[in-house]
């Protein structure tokens, strides 16, 4: 019985370690997605500044149209990057819930093992006392 409880606790500890590892990996993915959003926003700001400079310099309609197409493409990339960041955040939040659940299961397994150990310790002590009484 004790071996089963010890094995159960070991399995729960392994599950918790796996969940924590997944959460750390997803946190890194989330940071990467946030970095991509920041890079695209910086590119949009730079493109807007170049477009304004082009307009101030009196550029041709074709050059302005190229800048506008480039800005539209960057905005689509920003939308995609923001969507990716939101999905990564939701996935990370779900994984944190899985970590909490694994931690709860480990705590329960440890508590069950301790209850069993206390029960058998009390049972052994009672048997020892009973044997001592018989000897007297």
Protein language model annotation of sequence segments:
Residues 1-136:
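Charge-rich amphipathic alpha-helical interaction elements
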């Amino acid at each position: 019985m004790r071996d089963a409880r010890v094995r159960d606790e070991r399995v729960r500890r392994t599950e918790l370690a796996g969940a924590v590892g997944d959460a750390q990996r997803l946190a890194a993915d989330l940071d990467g997605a946030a970095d991509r959003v920041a890079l695209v926003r910086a590119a949009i700001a730079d493109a807007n500044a170049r477009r304004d400079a082009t307009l101030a310099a009196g550029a041709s309609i074709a050059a302005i149209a190229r800048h506008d197409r480039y800005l539209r493409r960057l905005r689509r990339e920003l939308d995609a990057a923001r969507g990716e960041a939101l999905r990564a955040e939701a996935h990370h939040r779900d994984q944190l819930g899985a970590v909490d659940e694994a931690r709860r299961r480990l705590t329960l397994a440890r508590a069950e093992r301790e209850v069993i150990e206390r029960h058998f310790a009390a049972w052994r002590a009672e048997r020892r006392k009973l044997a001592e009484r018989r000897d007297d």
